[in-house]
A protein has these predicted regions:
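Radical SAM/AdoMet-radical enzyme domain recognition
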Residues: 44-58, 67-160, 166, 170
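Short, small/polar residue-rich loop motifs at catalytic or cofactor-binding pockets
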Residues: 245-247
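Canonical Radical SAM [4Fe-4S] cluster-binding loop centered on the CxxxCxxC motif
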Residues: 1-40
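Glycine-rich phosphate-binding "P-loop"
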Residues: 32-33, 57-60
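Hydrophobic "anchor" residues
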Residues: 259-261
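Radical SAM enzyme [4Fe-4S]-AdoMet core and its adjacent flexible, acidic
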Residues: 31-36, 115, 119-121, 125-243, ...
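Residue-level recognition of short loop/turn positions
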Residues: 61, 88, 256-257
Length: 271
């Protein structure tokens, strides 16, 4: 059994952003157990090595930076791998000194989720601080009706260049396959447009065909390019639940301290 990555869900201590397309609100919250999570870290590392994991992604059912001490502990204990943090960026933008702390503990990539154009400017000092401490910044642009259709792919790349953003991910917002109908799935249905996402992808493909440099392709089909000095890719389906017979998308160390191979299946628990 091989796994593309190890994903660690920091035990939930709330969220400071109320995203109407929040995946966690559609898939539920396991009961957090920080003690069990810490006790299972060594086992998880052994499994990750055996599965030839190449990177660690830290995320959360809430905002991981709100559980600050646990976050730092996890980063420090997994720093033998490249470590990425997925965050809404709000806490870090208010307390830029925390970016320095993350770097000291061994974080490599800060991936910031954005769903409004003005957030690029709101986070300009955060992007600069990430660059100053030598970490890599990524913007994940969540494509909904909150993003104007008039905004082009090249427009977003120009913003990335302006703010020294290293990586740009275009993300299609869809409801998880196994999610029950709720106000959140209905919001996605009413406030996303496949045509809007396809328009940006079409513009991206034209730019990449003319001036892009293909860099690599991940095991699960994400193609990564260099365009104007920015790393470019896209995610057509935003949930990491696809696996093959021999290769897992992720090993998942969940809030409850157990390791799973699927976000939605309790039966996928390994230990």
């Amino acid at each position: 059994m091989r796994a593309a990555n190890l994903t660690i869900s920091i035990p939930y201590l709330g969220c400071d952003k109320n995203c109407p397309y929040c995946v966690s609100k559609m898939t539920g919250y396991p009961k957090p157990n920080s003690g069990k999570l810490r006790r299972n870290i060594d086992k998880t590392k052994t499994l990750a090595r055996a599965a030839q994991v190449t990177n660690v992604m830290i995320t959360g059912k809430g905002e991981p930076t709100l559980n600050w001490n646990t976050l730092l502990d996890i980063i420090e204990r997994f720093q033998e791998w490249p470590v990425e943090l997925q965050t809404n960026g709000l806490l870090l933008a208010k307390h830029l000194d925390k970016v320095n702390t993350l770097a000291v503990y061994g974080l490599d990539v800060v991936a910031i989720s954005i769903d409004k154009i003005e957030q690029f400017n709101d986070f300009k000092d955060l992007f600069k601080r990430i660059q100053d401490v030598g970490m890599t910044s990524r913007v994940t642009l969540n494509v909904t009706k909150m993003i104007p259709r008039t905004a082009t792919f090249n427009y977003f790349i120009s913003i990335c260049k302006q703010h020294n953003i290293d990586q740009f991910l275009l993300r299609n917002i869809v409801a998880p396959t196994h999610a029950q109908v709720s106000e959140y799935t209905e919001w996605i249905k009413e406030n996303t447009s496949q045509a809007h996402y396809d328009k940006l992808v079409g513009e991206m493909n034209v730019c990449l065909d003319k001036f892009g440099l293909f860099l690599r392709e991940t095991e699960f089909g994400m193609k990564i390019y260099d365009y104007r000095g920015v790393s470019i890719t896209r995610s057509d389906y935003c949930i990491q639940d696809s696996s093959t017979v021999n290769n897992l998308r992720s090993l998942i160390l969940m809030d409850d301290g157990h390791v799973y191979t699927n976000w939605y299946s309790k039966a996928s628990r390994l230990f």
